[in-house]
Amino acid sequence: MSFTVHLNKILQKYQDLEADLNGGKLDNKELALISKEYSNLKPIIEKLNRYLKAHENIKYLQQVIDTEQDLELKSIAEVELYDTLNYLPKLEEEVKISLLPKESDDHKNAIIEVRAGTGGDEAALFAASLFQMYNKYAERKKWKFELLSISDTEIGGCKEASALISGNGVFANLKFESGVHRVQRIPKTESNGRIHTSAATVVVLPEAEEVDVKIDAKDLKIDTYRASGAGGQHVNTTDSAVRITHIPTGVVVSQQDEKSQHKNKAKAMKILYARLYDLEKQKSKQEQAISRKVQVGTGDRSERIRTYNYPQGRVTDHRINLTLYKIEEIIQEGKLDEIINNLISENEAKKIADSNIQF
């Protein structure tokens, strides 16, 4: 099927849906389904109409230039034609992006997990800085940031921390943050001024509901125990902490931040659903090799994706060779949009190249 035929089919489908909605013959269920499909097509049609209108304008302006005797009008048409031809590639790109299949999890909320890696106390401090960076980024995006768990260290770092981030387009924006983040800086305790390298791992999971993944109660092993603080001392006199093991996969989730065992169990189950759902998605991606071609980076969570170099004030994303000298703004203020927008654009470009959409 040619691309022009494909576009005409989309336009016809949109017009048919519009006629159905205005016909007044739909029951509530049909109305809801058709309204959703119509809403999904609307932004595509708007971009497509702008593209088609630009093409019509080019033909008209070319005709004016070829036939107009008035030199002033001819000159105006030439300028407008030049501007329209320069703008056309951007319109083409917008249409192509709108026609790409939407990733099924992009609309979901996300659970973000940060774990200290190699580097001892420095790694724990870096993990805490990253976790705070995502908190600040969520504030900037007007998203809700709900702490799920945190394992603090005595010097203000954290061994691991997780949060549920809720809002519009959360997973679509944060999904490229998964991987190994590396920091290069001089520790405060370093008397010789040597630069140390530490690392932390970030995992971003789409929030999963019970409808997304089936968990059989008999497959769960649930243990309770007393919560402990940073120094290992018990901070609660009751067995409020919960550890849930999913026996078939071996996935283990522990939760102790709440004083209530019931709340800890609910949070642990939320994380468990997300991890099991992610396991299924990762397995599916591995089975479909083509999905690897359209990812920014390898998609492997052991991949080093970004370096934060404090002496140079530099942040480098290795997947797209992007370097910004804004380390304080990024880490302290959560100004991640420039990095994330570039990652999204690169991913879209790879998808377009892989889809072979031609005008």
Swiss-Prot record:
Q: Cytoplasm as a keyword?
A: yes
Q: How is it modified after translation?
A: Methylated by PrmC. Methylation increases the termination efficiency of RF1.
Q: Pfam families of this UniProt entry?
A: PCRF (PF03462), RF-1 (PF00472)
Keyword set includes Hydrolase: no
Q: Name one GO molecular function term.
A: translation release factor activity, codon specific
Its GO CC terms are: cytoplasm
Briefly, what is this protein's role?
Peptide chain release factor 1 directs the termination of translation in response to the peptide chain termination codons UAG and UAA.
- Family matches, as PANTHER family: LD18447P (PTHR43804:SF7)
Q: What is this protein called?
A: Peptide chain release factor 1
Origin organism is Orientia tsutsugamushi (strain Boryong) (Rickettsia tsutsugamushi)
Organism classification: Bacteria, Pseudomonadati, Pseudomonadota, Alphaproteobacteria, Rickettsiales
